[in-house]
């Protein structure tokens, strides 16, 4: 079972979002998919998963942890206006 912990949390008032860096420890498991990570992070932060955008998941070969760069928007319309189209597609928001 992967363990999620918040490394950094930063409020970005300009874009009406909160930015997170989350460390996922997944010993002897694969790196979590975007959808798996989105479910767990939305549950952990108690937010609507449609307002959660995962920008990237960074893993290094052989290490049992990954870093997830995530953003939680106050309004989904802001996310659709600000985020790149490919990021929205990867998060099933387009």
From Swiss-Prot:
Keywords for the protein's UniProt record, in alphabetical order: Ribonucleoprotein, Ribosomal protein
Record InterPro entries: Nucleotide-bd_a/b_plait_sf, Ribosomal_eS24, Ribosomal_eS24_CS, Ribosomal_uL23/eL15/eS24_sf
BP terms from Gene Ontology: translation
Gene Ontology annotations for the cellular component aspect, listed alphabetically: ribonucleoprotein complex; ribosome
Residue ranges the record marks as coiled coil: none
UniProt keyword GTP-binding, yes or no: no
Alphabetized SUPFAM superfamilies for the sequence: Ribosomal proteins S24e, L23 and L15e
Residues annotated as signal peptide: none
Family, per entry: Belongs to the eukaryotic ribosomal protein eS24 family.
HAMAP family noted in UniProt: Ribosomal_eS24 (MF_00545)
Protein name: Small ribosomal subunit protein eS24
Organism expressing this protein natively: Nanoarchaeum equitans (strain Kin4-M)
Encoding gene, per UniProt annotation: rps24e
């Amino acid at each position: 079972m992967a363990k999620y912990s918040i490394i950094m949390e930063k409020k970005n008032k300009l874009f009406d979002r909160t930015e997170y860096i989350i460390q996922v420890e997944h010993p002897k498991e694969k790196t979590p998919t975007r959808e798996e990570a989105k479910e767990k992070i939305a549950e952990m932060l108690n937010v609507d998963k449609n307002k959660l955008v995962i920008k990237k998941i960074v893993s290094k070969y052989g290490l049992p942890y990954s870093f997830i760069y995530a953003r939680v928007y106050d309004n989904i319309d802001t996310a659709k206006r600000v985020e790149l189209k490919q990021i929205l597609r990867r998060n099933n928001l387009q």
